[in-house]
Every structure is written in structure tokens, then in C-alpha cells.
Swiss-Prot record:
Species in which this protein is naturally found: Bacillus velezensis (strain DSM 23117 / BGSC 10A6 / LMG 26770 / FZB42) (Bacillus amyloliquefaciens subsp. plantarum)
Alphabetic keyword roster: ATP-binding, Cytoplasm, Ligase, Nucleotide-binding, RNA-binding, tRNA processing, tRNA-binding
Record's catalysed reaction(s): cytidine(34) in elongator tRNA(Met) + acetate + ATP = N(4)-acetylcytidine(34) in elongator tRNA(Met) + AMP + diphosphate
E.C. numbers: 6.3.4.-
Gene Ontology terms, MF aspect: ATP binding; ligase activity, forming carbon-nitrogen bonds; tRNA binding
Binding site for ATP: 7-20, 101, 162, 187-188
Enzyme class: ligase
Matching NCBIfam families: PRK13670.1
InterPro entries per the UniProt record, alphabetical: Rossmann-like_a/b/a_fold, tRNA(Met)_cyd_acetate_ligase
Cell compartment(s), UniProt: Cytoplasm
Function: Catalyzes the formation of N(4)-acetylcytidine (ac(4)C) at the wobble position of elongator tRNA(Met), using acetate and ATP as substrates. First activates an acetate ion to form acetyladenylate (Ac-AMP) and then transfers the acetyl group to tRNA to form ac(4)C34.
Gene Ontology BP term (one): tRNA modification
Name of the molecule in the record: tRNA(Met) cytidine acetate ligase
An annotated GO cellular component: cytoplasm
């Protein structure tokens, strides 16, 4: 029984994701698709529109067989660490391949780029430091460094988010010594950050444009770009909790957190670098919204994404020393199981003795500082939900067993 690994956020799960899962199984000749999915907060620092449990249900109804959670210590991170955590979890799970979307769908440039980087890693690191000193953002500086070492090759366009992530997935496979084989497929129709839904007959749209349509016009506006299960779960979540989460919902909590921190305390928060704490404390007194705060803080050096991640770490009070300690091991310390189909359950039963990290189904049965941070992130995520629903939401984190879905009878067995 072969499993293909997917690295996902499903914010929300849309038709493009369903196509991705289908192609992953076909192109890798795998019977099981295993997804490692970000929890409450995502790689760019924003909150997921709905909970990880709602997104797990969307995935299980649409071709994904196993969903595990990417711990917070990897989920809200730059591409390199996001990829390292994701790849290590899929390796722990025994996946034989990893499948990701890219701009042109050819794996060779990714493999060549990873090999070239290995040969010239010191040169690349030196150029990267020089470009950062000039005031460039990390992505821009990295792109310049990679351009230098990839001269004369079929160079990747590292200005594209999916290509950046793909490069780091392949790098993580190579550096970890995993036997997983990387595969890629070309993204179809919509670009990653397209803000508007396509006007043609396409049924594929970017998650960004779908979220925008949901917030502005409701589920009906995006329904043709979503599987039925996703539309249903989105509506059910809002009916239950009165919200689809967005960054603006957390502005008052960011403001409160900053009002209780001194500049010295703020400087110890992860991602607060180089005197940025003084700029943050000045800005928060003037800003009247999350967007205004971000516009005032953003510079060529400090990108929107980096600042957004920083704000999330401020909300969770994640200190540099704690994050560095938790990231010191080379691989993820546990596998948090969120859901599985019958086929996924059969795979896990067959592989149980071969898993290279503890499989966590109940929070009460396992303890780890990184898991404590996952729980804290879930509590922070629930802050904009009104009572008594917020308390019910928080209880679900401890009481919810992995979701089980019978793909033959098309029904959930415990959700």
C-alpha cells in the first residue's frame, strides 16, 4: 500500500485541491493520499478561515485519505522551515513520494536547483547576507542569491510562491536523506494570489479570490469553485460560530498584547528583529485597523508576510529562545492525526510499527512543549468567537477524536 504526501493548507478546500489530490494518486501510482495540513494559523501568518476540523472534513470527502497537523513551530514560518517540518512528517508517516504544484510542472529544475545549491551553499549564504544588508526582503535577497549560483541552468522562477516552496520541499528531502521521491504538476487556470474569481467558465480559482468572494458576497458567490462538502462545511462553521476568521478579527488582540509588553519584552518575541520593537510600539498607538497597522509597518525589508507571522507570534507570546529550542531537532517530534478514511485507517494499521514518530490521536496521551504551543495557538485562534461558542470550540481541541470517514457509504462515522 503506497502513500503519496501532500503539503496543504486548504483555506478553504477548493476544486483545484481536489484535482491536485486526484493527480497525486494517479501520477505516483499511490492508493493513499496523506496530507500534512497547517493548523489554526498558516504559513503567511494569517488565520485559517475555518477550523482544522472543518477543513479536515472537506478533504476527507474529496479524495484525501489521511490528514495530519503541521505543528505551529513549522506552520507559521518561512518556506525553508515550513518545508522541513512538512517533509519530516510525511517521512515519519512512511510516504513513498511527495507531490506538489508548480508553475511549469517539471521536476527536473527543482532537483537541479537543489543539487546546485548543495555545491555552492556557502557562496549562496554569503550573497544572501550581503543582499539583506542592502535592505532587501528575505525572498528578494534569496532570489538574487539563487540567480547567481544557477547561472546557465534551467533556472527556477523563484518569484512564484509555489516554486519557492517546491524548491524547499526537494531540498528538505535531499538534506534529510529521505527516500521519498518528489513529483510536481503544473498549476491550472488560476495563479496563487489572484484576488478576483475568473470570469470565464473555469471552475478553478485561487484560494485568495475564493476567500475574498466569501467575505464580500457569501458562499453563493464562490460555490461553483468549491466541492459541495466545502460549501456545506463553510456554512455550517459560520452558523455554529458566527465567523469566518480573518486578520482583522485579531487586531484588538494584537493591540492588547502590545499594550502589555515593554520594548525589551517585545524584542524577545520570535521574528521581532533589529530594533523593530520600537517601530511596532509607535505604530500600534496610531493604527485603527489591522490593515493600517500593516501598511505603516511594511518596508522593503519587512514584507507583509513576515510582519503577519510576527503578529501571530506576538499573539501566542512565542519567544525566540523557545522557538529555537523546539526547532533544534531535525525532524518533527510527533504526528497529530486529524482524520482518515477507511483506506487511510487501513494504511495506518499496516504501517503502525514502521512509523518513526509517535502517532497522537488523543491529547491526553502525549505531552511535548511543541504540542503545548499547538494548543495555545488554538486558544488564540478562538478569541474572536463569542461565548458560549468559544468555550465549546476550545473543548473540541481536547475531546475531538480523529475524524473517520467511510468513503464507500459516503458518511462520517464520528463527526
Amino acid at each position: 500500500m503506497k502513500a503519496v504526501g501532500l503539503v496543504v493548507e486548504y483555506n478553504p478546500f477548493h476544486n483545484g485541491h481536489r484535482y491536485h489530490a486526484e493527480q497525486a494518486k494517479i501520477k505516483t501510482d499511490s492508493s493513499v493520499a496523506a496530507a500534512v495540513m497547517s493548523g489554526p494559523f498558516l504559513q503567511r501568518g494569517e488565520p485559517a478561515a475555518v477550523s482544522k476540523w472543518a477543513r479536515t472534513k472537506m478533504a476527507l470527502e474529496n479524495g484525501v485519505d489521511i490528514v495530519i497537523e503541521l505543528p505551529y513551530i513549522y506552520a507559521v514560518q518561512k518556506a525553508e522551515l515550513f518545508a522541513r517540518g512538512s517533509v519530516s512528517l510525511l517521512h515519519h508517516l512512511g510516504c513513498s513520494s511527495l507531490f506538489f504544484g508548480s508553475e511549469n510542472g517539471r521536476i527536473e529544475p527543482f532537483i537541479e536547483a537543489s543539487e546546485a545549491f548543495s555545491r555552492k551553499e556557502d557562496d549562496c549564504s554569503l550573497i544572501l547576507k550581503e543582499e539583506l544588508k542592502k535592505g532587501l526582503s528575505y525572498p528578494a535577497a534569496a532570489s538574487k542569491a539563487f540567480s547567481h549560483i544557477f547561472k546557465g541552468r534551467d533556472m527556477l522562477d523563484l518569484s512564484k510562491p509555489n516554486n519557492i516552496l517546491g524548491f524547499h520541499y526537494v531540498r528538505a528531502i535531499h538534506t534529510s536523506g529521505s527516500a521519498m521521491k518528489p513529483y510536481t504538476t503544473a498549476r491550472i487556470a488560476s495563479q496563487y494570489h489572484d484576488a478576483e474569481l475568473p470570469g470565464d467558465n473555469s471552475r478553478i480559482a485561487s484560494a485568495t479570490s475564493i476567500r475574498k468572494a466569501l467575505i464580500e458576497k457569501g458562499t453563493a458567490a464562490a460555490r461553483s469553485f468549491l466541492p459541495e462538502a466545502s460549501a456545506r462545511e463553510l456554512e455550517a462553521y459560520r452558523n455554529s460560530y458566527g465567523i469566518w476568521h480573518s486578520t482583522e478579527d485579531y487586531f484588538s488582540y494584537v493591540k492588547y498584547s502590545l499594550s502589555t509588553l515593554s520594548a525589551e519584552e517585545l524584542s524577545r518575541i520570535y521574528e521581532v528583529e533589529e530594533g523593530l520593537e520600537h517601530r511596532i510600539l509607535r505604530t500600534i498607538r496610531q493604527a485603527r485597523s489591522y490593515r493600517e497597522m500593516m501598511e505603516r509597518l511594511k518596508t522593503k525589508r519587512y514584507t507583509w508576510t513576515r510582519l503577519q507571522r510576527m503578529n501571530t507570534h506576538i499573539l501566542t507570546r512565542t519567544k525566540k529562545e523557545d522557538m529555537h529550542r523546539l526547532l533544534k531537532p531535525s525532524s518533527a517530534p510527533y504526528i497529530r492525526l486529524l482524520g482518515m478514511t477507511k483506506k487511510g485507517q487501513a494504511y495506518l494499521s499496516a504501517k503502525k510499527k514502521e512509523l518513526t514518530a509517535p502517532l497522537v490521536s488523543k491529547l491526553s496521551s502525549f505531552s511535548h512543549p511543541a504540542l503545548d504551543l499547538d494548543i495555545l495557538a488554538g486558544r488564540v485562534y478562538s478569541l474572536p468567537i463569542n461565548e458560549p461558542e468559544r468555550t465549546l470550540f476550545e473543548k473540541q481541541e481536547f475531546s475531538q477524536a480523529p475524524i473517520r470517514y467511510d468513503e464507500d457509504e459516503k458518511r462520517f462515522l464520528n463527526a
